[in-house]
From Swiss-Prot:
It comes from Streptomyces avermitilis (strain ATCC 31267 / DSM 46492 / JCM 5070 / NBRC 14893 / NCIMB 12804 / NRRL 8165 / MA-4680). Belongs to the RecO family. HAMAP family: RecO. GO terms for biological process: DNA recombination; double-strand break repair. InterPro entries: ARFGAP/RecO (IPR037278), DNA_rep/recomb_RecO_N (IPR022572), NA-bd_OB-fold (IPR012340), RecO (IPR003717), RecO_C (IPR042242). SUPFAM superfamilies: ArfGap/RecO-like zinc finger, Nucleic acid-binding proteins. This is DNA repair protein RecO.
Length: 248
């Protein structure tokens, strides 16, 4: 029997029995963790209010073994709020749909429980904080998060130099299968010809150049979002359900 303490973001919850929930979190030290929180669905439970999606929490787990992830699910025995991002996110449709896509993305990129994913965790914390504060348009925050998540997981797209031969850009064509921008000689069937403005935007989002990103015209933001969605779909092998609501 062991106690573990960590901080994490609540990704989702699901009902268990009459009063309990299974809480899925992305934690700093243990990656994705599923744990049982007992009694949190009772009306008077203050504990349950802290364990809602988007919440940044300090949690204590109880495991029957010497490791957090082992036989059966650990119990979530304590929780303290670090930052209640959900309060500012769920009241705005654009923020909510973008935030939901961010949570789903983080879970998809951390499919093995108990494996630390510190970079993904830090990206999610920063993304939700930015979204909750309303510092930039939700679509831009989401696309920046998606691009950086792809990058930290080894799928960084190229938006200038050729992704196949390295020819200096800008290059005219773009292929999700090839890894981003490609030159004339390296283009493959299915390559598209995006606007230069959309590629500049995506490069800015990937590198954190918010001055350039915030100044981009809406039509190029929409075009860029389409490229990000297609690129993410290719590498995850199936799309995000939550992106359908963002696109609406």
């Amino acid at each position: 029997m062991s106690l573990f303490r960590d901080d994490g973001i609540v990704l989702r919850t699901q009902k268990l029995g009459e009063a309990d929930r299974i809480i899925t979190l992305l934690t700093r030290g243990h990656g994705r963790v599923r744990a049982v929180a007992r009694g949190v669905r009772r009306t008077k439970s203050k504990f349950g209010a802290r364990l809602e999606p988007f919440s940044h929490v300090d949690v204590q787990f109880f495991s029957r073994g010497s490791e957090l992830i082992g036989r059966g699910l650990p119990l979530c025995t304590q929780s303290e709020t670090i930052a209640p991002y959900g309060g500012a996110i769920v009241t705005d449709y654009a923020r909510y749909t973008a935030g939901t896509a961010m949570l789903e993305t983080a879970e998809r990129f951390t499919d093995h429980e108990g494996e630390p994913a510190v970079q993904q965790y830090l990206l999610l914390v920063g993304g939700l904080r930015t979204l909750a504060r309303g510092e930039h348009e939700p679509h831009l925050v989401l696309d920046a998060f998606l691009l950086r998540s792809l990058a930290v997981n080894g799928y960084a797209p190229s938006f200038s130099n050729c992704a196949k031969c390295g020819m200096p850009g800008p290059n005219r064509f773009f292929s999700v299968a090839a890894g981003g921008s490609v030159c004339v000689d390296c283009r493959v069937p299915g390559s598209v010809v995006p606007s230069a403005q959309a590629l500049v935007l995506l490069g800015a989002l990937l590198t954190g150049d918010w001055e350039t990103a915030d100044a981009c015209e809406p039509r190029y933001v929409r075009e860029g979002s389409g490229l990000v969605s297609a690129y993410l779909h290719w590498h995850l092998e199936r799309g995000l359900r939550s992106l359908r609501y963002v696109e609406k």
